[in-house]
C-alpha cells in the first residue's frame, strides 16, 4: 500500500515497526533533539530558528507517538490510509454483540466484590488474549514487510476492537 503522509519513523530515523525497541526510540530522540535544538540556532537567521523550532516540535511529537504502543499502531494505520475520518468501518456483528453483552454484565456486577472483580478481570483478559491470537498472523506479516490491504485491514480491525 502507498503511504499517504510523512511518518514519525522517518523523522526519528527508525525502521517502520509495530515493535520498536523503547531504548532505540529514546536514543534517536535524544540524538536528534540535541542536533536540532533551537538554542544551536540562536545566532542564525529567523528562518533557521523557526525551522529548528518546527523540527524540534516534530521530533517531540514523533517521540510521544512512537513511545506509546496504541498511538504507534494508530500512526501506522494513518500512514497507510486505514483510518479515514468519518469513514464507516463495520466490525463483525458477533464481536459487537459479545461486547454489548459483556458491558451489560459488567454494569450489573458488583465490582467492589473481590470475587466478582476477579471474574470480570478474567473475562477481559480472555477477550484480550483472543484478540492478540487473532491479530498475530497480521502483525507477523507486517513485521516481515508485507503492507498489502489485507494485512493492514487485519491490523486495523484489531486496533478498532482493542
Task: Show the residue positions of the predicted features.
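C-terminal accessory/regulatory regions appended to core domains
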Residues: 1-162
Amino acid at each position: 500500500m502507498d503511504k499517504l503522509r510523512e511518518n514519525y519513523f522517518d523523522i526519528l530515523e527508525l525502521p517502520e515497526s509495530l515493535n520498536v525497541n523503547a531504548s532505540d526510540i529514546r536514543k534517536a530522540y535524544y540524538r536528534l533533539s540535541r542536533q536540532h535544538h533551537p538554542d544551536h540556532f540562536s545566532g542564525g537567521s529567523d528562518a533557521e530558528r523557526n525551522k529548528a523550532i518546527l523540527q524540534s516540535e516534530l521530533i517531540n511529537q514523533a517521540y510521544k507517538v512512537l513511545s506509546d504502543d496504541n498511538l504507534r499502531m494508530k500512526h501506522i494505520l494513518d500512514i497507510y490510509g486505514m483510518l479515514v475520518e468519518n469513514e464507516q468501518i463495520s466490525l463483525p456483528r458477533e464481536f459487537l454483540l459479545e461486547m454489548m453483552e459483556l458491558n451489560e454484565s459488567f454494569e450489573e456486577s458488583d465490582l467492589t466484590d473481590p470475587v466478582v472483580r476477579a471474574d470480570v478481570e478474567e473475562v477481559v483478559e480472555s477477550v484480550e488474549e483472543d484478540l492478540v491470537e487473532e491479530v498475530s498472523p497480521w502483525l507477523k506479516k507486517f513485521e516481515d514487510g508485507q503492507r498489502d490491504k489485507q494485512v493492514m485491514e487485519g491490523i486495523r480491525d484489531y486496533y478498532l476492537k482493542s
